[in-house]
Amino acid sequence: MSKTLFDKIWEKHVITGEIGEAQLIYVDLHLVHEVTSPQPFDGLRSTNRRVRRPDLTFATMDHNVPTKDIFNVQDQMSRLQMDTLVKNTKEFDIPLASIGDDKQGIVHVVGPERGLTQPAKVIVCGDSHTATHGAFGAIAFGIGTSEVEHVLATQTIWQVKPKTMGIKVTGKLPKNTYAKDIIMGIIAKYGVSFGVGYAIEFYGETVENLSMEARMTMCNMSIEAGSRTGMVQPDQTTFDYIEGREQAPKDFESAKNYWSQFYTDDESDFDETLTFDVSNLKPMVTWGTNPGMATPVDQSLPAIKDDNDANAYEYIGLHPNMKPVDINLDYIFIGSCTNSRYEDLEIAANMMKGHHLAPNVTAWVVPGSRAIRNRAIKSGIAQIFEEAGCEWREPGCSACLAMNPDKIPAGKHVASTSNRNFIGRQGAGSRTHLASPAMVAAAGIAGHFVDITTDEFV
């Protein structure tokens, strides 16, 4: 019987339970950060339990980290959460990449970077964008606080198996369009809830030609499509990325042979299929207050269809028939678990090289990990950003969410490489416009969005 990639991995991990009901599945990797872990560790203490597999658990600090001065944590709650993670990981013998550590960074960046993220695994974390790790051909999803405690105690989790959806991506990406534009285009076309109840697999020649960094960007935003899980079949690109990393399997050839068994046998095995052609795709920009409210950079903003649109326009300070190029910007943010990897920074730096920020723009560039930061400094990329007038920061989640000092002021427009543009997401009253690293970098130079596919940029 032919099966999907998701089905094959799921079946390998089921311990007990019937299809259609909650099943107990084994967890291969549990990633932990400072925000969603304090209560679970307290729960373990209250029942005198230990962490079942500390060797399959890894913790880092990211959400609360002040990226301008990582050791100067002013917020009392942030400091408490960070100190508590140090205490808990020490008590329960869990590896921790604390602030200042060479391995520290955003959890969904350092997991793959260290080689912890591998094909055919079940990976969980108390964070919705855990779907990022599915780019390696893994089942990866975010879990709630009580589930974090359950995984710590048992290395298992109860889950109802979702249906499967295949999204076939076809065509050749035009110049200066990227994976961020693909996933934003898919969400703009199909909406923010089409993936509810499904595990999404991205496939097709376009996906096969993407780098691992680009695949991670697409899987990262599966959650913005309503799914908890996005994934890509493992292939030679996957294997090349993992090989030689710190936590890569010692017998790599055997591991690669095992991973190669995991693929979708036939398109007809999916419960649902969609297609998306990128041949004429333009860079995407969000204009509203959810990721589905996005438009190609060269098109006018849409007419108001309902109260949601009207409210979004009022909040964001725009109106129909404007174009993204008419949006004047106050801030740009290059970072987050969506687009803070070396490749993302390199793309943005190439766009900024030899230019300077517009006078009205403040720019924060936040690498996803200490390793990426060090590499960017060594290669000269960091210098390009600094010469352009950007603030070159320490690794952390930063302005993706208003949980640390990196907040966008009320009423200000920010072009952001992050994944969510909800009301107040980047600071109370902030106005977020999502786009690719290349688009955000170019917007910082111009002071507004520009079409980077035109002759001037191509």
Curated annotation (Swiss-Prot):
- Source domain of life is Bacteria
Give the molecular function GO annotations. Answer: 3-isopropylmalate dehydratase activity; 4 iron, 4 sulfur cluster binding; metal ion binding
List ligand-binding residues for [4Fe-4S] cluster: C337, C397, C400
Give a single Pfam family match. Answer: Aconitase
Could you tell me which pathway this protein works in? Amino-acid biosynthesis; L-leucine biosynthesis; L-leucine from 3-methyl-2-oxobutanoate: step 2/4
UniProt EC number: 4.2.1.33
The reactions it catalyses are:
(2R,3S)-3-isopropylmalate = (2S)-2-isopropylmalate
Do you know which NCBIfam families this protein is assigned to? leuC, PRK05478.1, PRK12466.1
Q: Belongs to which family?
A: Belongs to the aconitase/IPM isomerase family. LeuC type 1 subfamily.
Q: How does it assemble?
A: Heterodimer of LeuC and LeuD.
Record protein name field: 3-isopropylmalate dehydratase large subunit
Report the source organism: Leuconostoc mesenteroides subsp. mesenteroides (strain ATCC 8293 / DSM 20343 / BCRC 11652 / CCM 1803 / JCM 6124 / NCDO 523 / NBRC 100496 / NCIMB 8023 / NCTC 12954 / NRRL B-1118 / 37Y)
